[in-house]
Amino acid sequence: KDTFVYTRNENSQITPFKPAIDLVIVSITDSDKVTTGVINTTLTPDASNMNMVFGRLLINNIHGSELTALVMPMQIEIFNDSKTWEIHTADTTTQMADDDLKFIDKLSSAYNSKPEVVNKPALSGVLNVNLSSPGPDIDGYIDVTPELSDTGANLEWLKFDWSGTSSTFDENPTAKATFGIYKGNPVQIYIQQAFPK
């Protein structure tokens, strides 16, 4: 099985396209080291039913009561022909394990659970994260980061430039789950997640 990878750089974020792949075969050597000699032929596989897309994994902030579980939205998105982001509803195969979710506990008492991926595999591009209730009078927040590197989910192609400073699209997404508030933090005047590009 052969694979090829498109390098992610400052020119990578483009609309969907049909790949044009030419395979140049110079010679063939089998497992017994027998070779055909020089062939010099080019094969062009039919890629008319393929569509290459630029994607990312988006995870959103959420808040609510410390007495109930929270479901943090997490979805696979693609950069479409309109140059906007949309949920990749055709994705029903992307897998992520619970252990691929790294979290930082900033609750007033230790969080006795772990974030869990809801859909395994993705359901129409949606994975979501379940966070169980921390319990009465336990407030604060948990930062959740899906680890997309090969030491985690091994989904490098779903990283993105979340900080607006990475031309290689090599950053994991992060979101905050805040427990113990119902309508937002009264101390904060306004909060918004920044989406670069």
Tell me the role of every PLM-derived stretch.
Residues 1-197:
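Core sequence-specific DNA-binding domains of diverse transcription factors
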